[in-house]
Structure formats: structure tokens, C-alpha cells
Design a protein with these regions (language model features):
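Long, contiguous bundles of hydrophobic transmembrane helices that form the permeation core
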Residues: 152-247, 259, 263-283
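Hydrophobic mid-bilayer segments of alpha-helices in multi-pass membrane transport proteins
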Residues: 1-7, 23-32, 149-154, 208-218, ...
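Interfacial loop-to-helix junctions that mark the boundaries of transmembrane helices
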Residues: 12-21, 139-143, 240-257, 323-327
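Membrane-core helix-loop-helix motifs of multi-pass transport proteins
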Residues: 91-181, 196-208
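Hydrophobic packing and interface segments
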Residues: 143-150, 190-194, 200-213, 217-221, ...
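Juxtamembrane/transmembrane-helix interface segments of polytopic membrane transporters
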Residues: 122-130, 224-227, 231, 305-310
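Membrane-interfacial helical/loop segments at transmembrane boundaries in membrane proteins
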Residues: 129-136, 232-242, 316-321
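Membrane-embedded alpha-helical segments and adjacent helix-loop junctions characteristic
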Residues: 5-101, 272-347
Length: 347
């Protein structure tokens, strides 16, 4: 335990890394933005518009996916935003909570894993420690080969358009449509709760949700190319978008973009008169609380990676073990994938 916490590869060490800390700051700013958009009426306005526009179950499911695709910056930010917006919309079309959870979760993570401007891109690229290739560059090159994420998104479209359900999901959907029971299980989260949090003052609009998200994405992209030397006249990537993007410091850039996006959201809602200063300050601790789970998951993942790499030297062991394997080493990726698939079935 002492080694995991205080060693050169322990929790303290990974949290002291500027890139990792940048991702954590980014997650906190996203949590604050979600709470601000809820308090400012952005979720309420978009849900109101969607309720008037969406007329069928298929359209409600596809809109859930589309909104999830548009909010690709972080999977938890995606889940919190899309869940708050689409819950009442899907409820009006008798779509079960289990189906809504599937639509949101099956969109959030895959989209983040194929979006270069996301917290996942920053985290995954950080695992690449090589002078031969940049982490972001490798992340971008693997996108066409990320079949799981791409096929998951295709699967959502097929299931929604063809109205196909099977297994436990079929039971949940049958109960929702025939028995008017959206939950099926004894746990009934959000039952009886107000659909949305109303803005403190004034009437909200769809822009109250879309504008902060668009600004966040834009400032994150600008921050990424800035950190890569796009605006530096002495850099070899001066005015080279692709080169600067590949050479960017993703953790620091996303933290900067998140802070600017959060600041814009606060000022925007102040000028709109949607929330007061006191209300906006309440979003700081509430937003942080919403992001505790992903922060802990990332921290433990970084620690495990550091421990296996520098404490157990697993990479060196695998390299030496495969040195004499000859052509059999080409099967190593398949063996790793098979191991990942079978581990969850072991009790």
C-alpha cells in the first residue's frame, strides 16, 4: 500500500504529472458547466424543443444518439448532459429507462474514443511513451481501426430504425410500452422528480445548451493547436494545423479550454439574467461532486499503468518473452483481446 501511494510510480506520482492533473481540471470544469447549463435552463429549453419536434419512438432514440455524438468532448459530460435533456423526451414516447441508459452509454464512450478532441484522447495518448511517434498522432491513426466503437454506433442506428430488442431489453421495452412501467426493476431513479430545473429568471432557449458546448469545443481545439506551436513563429509547426495538433500537450490544453469554456458559460448566463452569482457559485462544488467517479477511475487507471510499467516492468517481461517467439508474436494482439473478452466471464 505504501508503494502504491508514495513510490515513484504511485498515486502521488501520477497526480503530480502535469498532463494527468490537466485532465482532472478539465473534468471538474465540465461538471461545473453541466450544472450551470441545468441551472440556466439550457437542458429545459432543449427538452422543450425536442418534445415538440420529436413525434416517434425511432426519432427520440436517434436524437438521443445524435446529441451524444455532438457532445464528444467527454463521456461523463456526455452522459450527464444527454441524460438530463432526453429523459423526459424518451419518457413521453414510452422508452424504458434501460433503453435510454443503453443509448446514452453506447454513444458516450465510443464517440470519445474516436474524437481527437476529448478527455479520452488525452488520457490514451498519454500512455504512449515513444520518441518515434506522438501519442495524439497514434490516437488519430487508430480511429479507422477502432471497429468496436464504430460498430457500436452503427448498432444503435440499426436497433432504433428497425425497432429490434432482445433479451432483458425486450422485457424492459415491453413493460414500458404495454404496462406503462419505464423501470421494471424495483429501483426507480428520478420517478416523480421534476423534468428539468427551471432557470432563476427569464425564459431559456436552446442556445443556452448549444452555445456553451460549441464554445467549449472551439476553445479546446484552439488550445490544442496553441500548445502544439501553431501560433509560435519559431516553432516548426507554425501555421501547420495537423502538425501542431499532433504535437499538442493534450492535458494542459484541455484544462485551459475547459477553464475558458466554464468562464464563458458563467458570464453568458449572468448577462442573460438566467442565474445569479450565488447560484453560479453553487455549481462549483456540485459540479465537482458529479465528476468524483471519473476522477477516481482515471487516477486508479494511471496508477495501475505506472505500477505495471515501472514497478513490475511488465512491458520488459513481455518484450523478452516474445523475443524468441518469431512469427507467433503477430498473434499477441489477438491473445490480449481474447483475454479481455474472457475475463468478465470468470467468476
Amino acid at each position: 500500500i505504501v508503494a502504491l501511494v508514495g513510490a515513484d510510480y504511485g498515486i502521488v506520482s501520477v497526480l503530480a504529472d502535469s498532463g494527468n492533473m490537466g485532465i482532472i481540471v478539465f473534468l471538474v470544469t465540465l461538471g461545473i458547466m453541466v450544472d450551470l447549463m441545468n441551472k440556466g435552463g439550457g437542458s429545459e429549453a432543449f427538452g422543450r424543443w425536442a418534445s415538440k419536434t420529436v413525434k416517434t419512438r425511432c426519432a427520440a432514440q436517434l436524437l438521443t444518439m445524435l446529441l451524444g455524438v455532438l457532445i464528444f468532448i467527454d463521456d461523463y459530460f456526455n452522459c450527464l448532459t444527454v441524460g438530463a435533456v432526453m429523459r423526459p423526451v424518451t419518457e413521453s414516447h414510452k422508452i424504458s429507462r434501460a433503453k435510454l441508459a443503453y443509448l446514452i452509454d453506447a454513444t458516450a464512450a465510443p464517440v470519445c474514443m474516436i474524437a481527437p478532441v476529448s478527455s479520452w484522447a488525452a488520457a490514451v495518448s498519454g500512455y504512449v511513451q515513444s520518441d518515434a511517434v506522438n501519442g495524439i498522432e497514434m490516437f488519430i491513426k487508430q480511429i479507422p481501426w477502432n471497429y468496436y466503437c464504430l460498430l457500436t454506433l452503427v448498432m444503435i442506428v440499426v436497433l432504433s430504425v428497425m425497432n429490434i430488442d432482445y433479451g432483458s431489453m425486450l422485457t424492459h421495452e415491453y413493460n414500458a410500452q404495454v404496462k406503462d412501467d419505464l423501470f421494471t426493476t424495483p429501483e426507480r431513479p428520478f420517478e416523480g422528480a421534476d423534468d428539468y430545473e427551471k432557470p432563476a429568471r427569464g425564459r431559456s432557449s436552446v442556445l443556452d445548451l448549444l452555445l456553451p458546448v460549441v464554445v467549449l469545443i472551439v476553445v479546446c481545439i484552439v488550445s490544442l493547436i496553441w500548445s502544439g506551436g501553431y501560433y509560435d513563429g519559431e516553432s516548426e509547426y507554425f501555421h501547420d494545423f495537423v502538425g501542431a495538433f499532433s504535437n499538442s500537450s493534450s492535458g494542459m490544453a484541455l484544462a485551459l479550454g475547459g477553464l475558458m469554456g466554464m468562464l464563458f458559460t458563467v458570464v453568458y448566463f449572468w448577462l442573460r439574467g438566467a442565474i445569479s452569482f450565488e447560484k453560479s457559485m453553487e455549481s462549483v462544488p456540485q459540479g465537482f461532486i458529479q465528476m468524483i467517479a471519473p476522477i477516481l477511475i482515471l487516477t486508479f487507471a494511471w496508477t495501475l499503468c505506472s505500477f505495471t510499467r515501472f514497478g513490475m516492468y511488465s512491458a520488459v517481461f513481455v518484450k523478452n518473452a516474445m523475443a524468441g517467439a518469431g512469427d507467433l508474436k503477430v498473434f499477441l494482439p489477438a491473445a490480449v483481446s481474447y483475454t479481455h473478452l474472457t475475463l468478465p466471464t470468470i467468476r
